[in-house]
Amino acid sequence: MTFAVQPATFGNFDEHGCEWATDLDHARDIAFDWSADEGGAKMIVWRVGTVSATRWLEVVA
């Protein structure tokens, strides 16, 4: 599985605006750090497949 992180305010998945992760733990770390840097903004971890991306979880620092 591939995971990516982006702010919840983006709405839909943006493969060019996200930050790609090596695995789910890495995605959680990215999301937490990004949320903390943005004052506690909601981040979405996306599970990215060959056909579509699915909102997998929400992270807030």
Give the positions of each predicted feature:
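Short aromatic-glycine-(Arg/Gly/Cys) micro-motifs in beta-strand/loop hairpins
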Residues: 1-17, 44-48
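Solvent-exposed serine/threonine-rich low-complexity stretches and specific carbohydrate-binding patches
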Residues: 17-19, 59
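Conserved aromatic
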Residues: 20-25
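Short, mixed-charge low-complexity intrinsically disordered segments
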Residues: 33-61
